[in-house]
Structure formats: C-alpha cells, structure tokens
Design a protein with these regions (language model features):
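Mature catalytic core of soluble alpha/beta enzymes
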Residues: 1-223
Length: 223
C-alpha cells in the first residue's frame, strides 16, 4: 500500500498513481479489495474519508517534512495551491476492473492515499490469517495506533489496552484503560505526525471541507 516507494516486480499504490491518466495498472487482488473498501467508506462517511485526496495530502506532507527539518522556516501551504489540488480528488475517477484486476485513475493529476484505511486493513488481514490459518486463539498485537485482540487473555480475562495521553509531556502516560476481547482499539491524534507554525501545531489529519488539519480533538479512539 506504499505511495512513496516502488518495488521491483510489484505494482502498488505508487504504481497506480504514477500511471494516472496514462494506463490501467494490474495489481494484486488485495489492493482491489482495499480500494473497494475505501470507496465504500467514502460513501458511508459522505466523503469525509476519501482515498482520492492524495494530491492535497502530498502537499501537506511536503510542507510538514520541510517544517520538521527546519522549524524556523516552517510555513503553511498556500490555500490556492491546496484548492487547485482539491480539484483532482473525485473518487469517481477511480476505475476498477475486477475481471482484469486493474486500477486506472482517469484524472492525470489525481493520486491515491490510503493512509486512513491501509494500516487497519492490513491489521485485519493479519488477524484473519492468525486465526484461520495458524489456529491462534489468544493474541494481542499492535501496529502503530492499531491494537487488535484475538480472543481474550489465556487466563480467561479480557485484554487490557492503554490509550495514550495526547499530552505527551504529561506525567500520566495513559488517559484510560479499556478491556477488549475479539476487538480492535484504534487511536489517532495530533501528537505524532505534526509540525508547528507560529506556535500552533498542525497534524497529518486533513479535513476535506477546509483542506486544513483537523483541530476538533487532540486524540480519537475507536473500539
């Protein structure tokens, strides 16, 4: 699901983006399934989870990287640049041919970014493999902010998962403990991938309506 690196002998999301407006790209069935999930989530969230936002997100990524490397020169991307990029985020321009196992972006200036769903999808696939192929009954594993529980603890109790305090400088490392069995605990917030401009923190979660980083909450956890 990498959008930044190509791999010899493998077509991935980057390959699809590189061929936008040029030609369909043959991909693995799991990439097809991931993109179908993304399209479904776009419909369910009225466009608030749009995997076709790559053109906007890449601008923020570049400014965030530059600002992190040189904080004194950190700046926000110009709104007109973001608005021009936002003209190329129509998810209906993703053409999936399941029979041929290809994906084609009809807009040459469009790009995909599956960061909102890619990690969760991969975690779910690992959990399914562990249960169905390896016969694992009890397991707790974490991939970044995604924690997945298979069954409960071997002693019969639930798994205990701590939710990180978004105020990272606080003496209290966790703000809450939740107990789960056969569930996932997914957390994202403004305290990991961000940069600071004029004393204000700008995170990696972008509001599609404003084209600006979301600032409603410091952290959100979904169980």
């Amino acid at each position: 699901y990498d959008i930044y690196h190509g791999y010899e002998g493998m077509n991935n999301i980057k390959t699809i983006n590189d061929n936008a407006g040029i030609q369909p790209v043959k991909v693995d069935e799991e990439i097809i399934e991931l993109l179908k999930l993304g399209i479904m989530m776009d419909e369910k969230t009225d466009g608030n989870m749009n995997i076709a936002m790559g053109s906007v997100l890449s601008i923020w990524h570049d400014y965030r990287e530059a600002g992190s490397e040189d904080p004194d020169s950190a700046e926000l991307p110009p709104m007109d640049e973001l608005e021009r990029a936002a003209e190329h985020t129509d998810i209906h321009n993703i053409v999936i041919d399941e029979e041929a196992s290809t994906v084609y972006l009809t807009d040459p200036d469009m790009s995909l970014d599956v960061g909102s769903i890619g990690k969760g999808y991969a975690v779910q696939k690992v959990a399914e493999y562990a249960k169905n192929e390896l016969g694992i009954q009890y397991m707790l594993f974490s991939v970044g902010g995604n924690v997945c529980a298979i069954g409960g603890h071997p002693d019969g109790s639930a798994w205990a998962v701590g939710i990180q305090n978004p105020e990272v400088e606080s003496d209290q490392a966790y703000i809450k403990k939740v107990e789960v069995q056969d569930l996932s605990v997914v957390t994202s917030g403004n305290y990991q991938r961000y940069y600071t401009v004029d004393g204000k923190r700008y995170c990696h979660i972008i509001n599609q309506d404003t084209l600006m980083p979301a600032d409603n909450f410091s952290s959100v956890t979904i169980i």
